[in-house]
Amino acid sequence: MQVQCNEKAFKGGFIINSQIATAPPKTLDTTITIGKPTVEDGAAMWELVNKSTLDTNSPYKYIMMCEYFAETCVVAKENERLVGFVTAFIPPEHQDVIFVWQIGVDSSQRGKGLASKLLQELISRDICSNVNYVEATVTPSNKASQALFQKLAREYNTQCEVSECFSEDLFPGDDHEAELTFRIGPLHP
C-alpha cells in the first residue's frame, strides 16, 4: 500500500507533501521512562504547555485527562521530571478511532523522536486493540505536527487524509487558525 496524504477540498486549502525530508532524529535519552499519567502529572503537563506555543487549556483539563483518560494518555519522564505527553481519547461514537487531543514535548527533548515514541506507546496499548485510525486536528501553520502524523502514516504504510474540521470563523477573536483533521489509517489491514 502506498503512503498518501490526500487533501480534501476546503476553504484556504494547502497541499500536504508526504515526502517531507527530515533530519535524522537525535538519540532519545535512555533515562526517559514512558507510561500512564497520574493526577499528579496534570500540573506538570499544564506547565509544559505554558512554556510552549501549544494552545493552553485550564490545569483542570490536564488533571481530568490524567484521572479519567489515563489509559489513553501517555507521559514521558526524565528522572521523574515530565518531558512529554499525549492526551487522547476514544470517541464513544467511533470505537475504531483514537483522537489525539494534544502532544507536548519539552524543548530539551525536541528532535529526538519522543513524540513518535509516545504515539507508538499509545497505539500499542490494550485499550487501542480495536483502533484502526488515529485522528487529530492540526492548524495549517503547525508543520511539526503535520510531519509527525505523516511519519506515523509512513510507519504504518497507510494513508494520511487531511480535511477541514473547524474553520477559523468558529473561534472567538481573530487569532485562531482553522483546524484540519488528519486521519491516519487503516492501521491494521
Swiss-Prot record:
Pfam families, per the entry: Acetyltransf_1
Pathway(s) it belongs to: Amine and polyamine biosynthesis; ectoine biosynthesis; L-ectoine from L-aspartate 4-semialdehyde: step 2/3
GO BP, one annotated term: ectoine biosynthetic process
Taxonomic superkingdom: Bacteria
Keyword line: Acyltransferase, Transferase
Annotated ranges, domain N-acetyltransferase: 32-183
EC number: 2.3.1.178
Entry's Gene Ontology molecular function annotations: diaminobutyrate acetyltransferase activity
Gene3D superfamilies, A to Z: 3.40.630.30
Top EC class, one word: transferase
Family per record: Belongs to the acetyltransferase family. EctA subfamily.
PANTHER family attached to this UniProt entry: N-ACETYLTRANSFERASE, UPF0039 PROTEIN C11D3.02C
UniProt name for this protein: L-2,4-diaminobutyric acid acetyltransferase
Organism: Halalkalibacterium halodurans (strain ATCC BAA-125 / DSM 18197 / FERM 7344 / JCM 9153 / C-125)
Organism lineage: Bacteria, Bacillati, Bacillota, Bacilli, Bacillales
Gene expressing this chain: ectA
